[in-house]
Structure formats: C-alpha cells, structure tokens
Regions:
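Bacterial N-terminal signal peptides
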Residues: 17-29
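Bacterial N-terminal signal peptides that target proteins for export
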Residues: 5-20
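Active-site lining segments that contact anionic ligands and/or coordinate catalytic metals
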Residues: 239
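Extracytoplasmic cell-surface/polysaccharide-interacting catalytic and binding patches
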Residues: 32-104, 108-129, 133-236, 247-259
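Conserved metal-phosphate-binding beta-hairpin within the catalytic cores
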Residues: 242
C-alpha cells in the first residue's frame, strides 16, 4: 500500500513546481493585493464559531516548518463548502460539540513543497507523524501530485467540546510521542480524542480502523455522519479529511491575512 516515490513521481514534482510558478504569474491582482479570487471566502467570515488551528502556517506539522503560500493562519474555502461547514457546526451545537479545522485551501506551491521534503534525507525531526514508515513511503494514498485542497473544496478537521478548553502551546523542542500514542503523550490538542493525531501516516488513522477504542470509533462515526449530512465525503484513509462538491480548478494564490 505504501510505495517509494518512483521516477515518474519525481518528474511530477518538477511539473508541480512549474505549474505553481505559472499560476503565481497568472494570479489575479486581487489575490496579490491580499484579497481572494472570486468564489473563495474566509471561513471566519462565514462561520466565526469554528475553531481554527492552521497547522501548515506554523511548525506543528510533518515538515516541521511553515509551508510556502501560508502567509496567514486562516482557513480559506470555496463559498459553498464554507457555508456547508457552517451548517455542520450548527447541527453539532445541540450535542455541545463543534468543529476545529486544521487545513482548508492549500496553495499548489505547498503541495510541491511536500513532495520536495519527502525526497530529502530524513533527519527524524518529525518522525512522530510517521512512526512505522520510511519517509520516502509517505505519499502513496496520502498526498498526491494534485490535491483537492488546492481546489478549495477539501478540509481537514476534527471535533471539539463546547466550550472548547484552551490548548497548551506547541513546543517545537519537546519530545512528543508518536501520532498513534495515547492523546496525553501526543502534541497538545484541545480536540476530542479520535485515536490518532492529525496528519498521522499510519493505518490507525484510517477512518474505519478496528484497533481504536469504542469511544474513538464512535467519535469518528459521529464526525463522518455530521459531515455527510451536509454533503461532505470522507477520505477513508484519513478520518480528518473531507471534500465537498465537484472537482474544480486548482489554485496557487497565497493565503493572506483578512482585511
């Protein structure tokens, strides 16, 4: 299931970088000025109650650093996807639950950066995200040459209790346990325990994995049902990943701070 990146895949990495560069040159003036292209919105403007923990805008991710294009820690989505998320948030409120997003729209340049990172020698600094795998095996089934995130129709998220407790700050120097460990041993997160951390490259992160506890399985099922009820589709290898609507054109505009 997990295979090393082949020579054609390496060529795809170069193509992604070229596409990202061309997209940047053709980027609408509004995006360059700090606005958003037509059809895209800041989730905070549609559903301000949804918590945001934008992992690729900081160091708490499997690359250990902010990703290109994440100039602000803001969730950006196609309007229809954002409005559907707002409905999920309202549905969950009756159970004293809410959503927390980890990633939304992802510039194409960030997808290219993932692939370049995978080909570099492994220094083990972020091994907690892939405890059982060789770094070169990470992207089969997880991160493709083309991501629905770049189309603005995919979102990575989890459940939080309401009111959500404050999360302890992430310490990049700390020796956190692997993403498959008990929640108390993993990097801090104020979400409900879903059995693994976000971006955990392991079979245990598969939505229907049978080794998680009954409570963890119930929470995953609850999240999937709530999202499905508003038109989202779950990716079976990642309990946190959902997409909405038809495929769209991939984008590369940077995520800038809201005006």
């Amino acid at each position: 299931m997990f295979l090393p990146m082949s020579h054609p895949a390496k060529r795809n990495v170069r193509r992604i970088g070229t596409w990202a560069a061309l997209a940047a040159l053709l980027m609408p003036a509004a995006a360059l000025a700090g606005g958003l292209p037509p059809g895209f919105v800041y989730l905070r403007d549609i559903a301000p109650g949804i918590a945001q923990d934008m992992r690729y805008a900081g160091a708490n991710n499997f690359t250990g650093r902010p990703l290109p294009g994440y100039d602000a820690a803001e969730c950006v989505l196609r309007r229809a996807a954002a409005e559907a998320l707002a409905k999920v948030q309202a549905d969950l409120a009756a159970q004293n639950l809410g959503l927390k997003v980890y990633d939304c729209y992802r510039p194409m340049r960030a997808v290219a950066a993932f692939a370049r990172w995978a080909q570099r020698a492994d220094d083990g600094a972020t091994k907690r995200f892939y405890p059982k795998l060789d770094k070169r095996q990470l992207f089969a089934g997880y991160i493709a040459a083309h991501s629905a995130h770049s189309e603005g129709i995919a979102v990575d998220l989890t459940l939080v209790p309401l009111p959500a407790p404050p999360a302890a700050p992430f310490d990049p120097r700390a020796a956190y346990g692997p993403c498959t460990a008990a929640a108390i041993a993993r990097a801090p997160d104020n979400s409900l325990d879903m059995g693994t951390g976000f971006d955990c490259f392991d079979d245990k992160a598969h939505t229907a994995n049978g080794t998680v506890t009954p409570d963890q399985a119930r929470r995953r099922a609850l999240l999937v049902a709530a999202m499905r009820g508003r038109g989202f589709r779950n990716y079976f290898r990642e309990w946190w990943h959902f997409s909405f609507g038809a495929r769209r054109e991939a984008q590369d505009f940077p995520i800038r701070a809201r005006r």
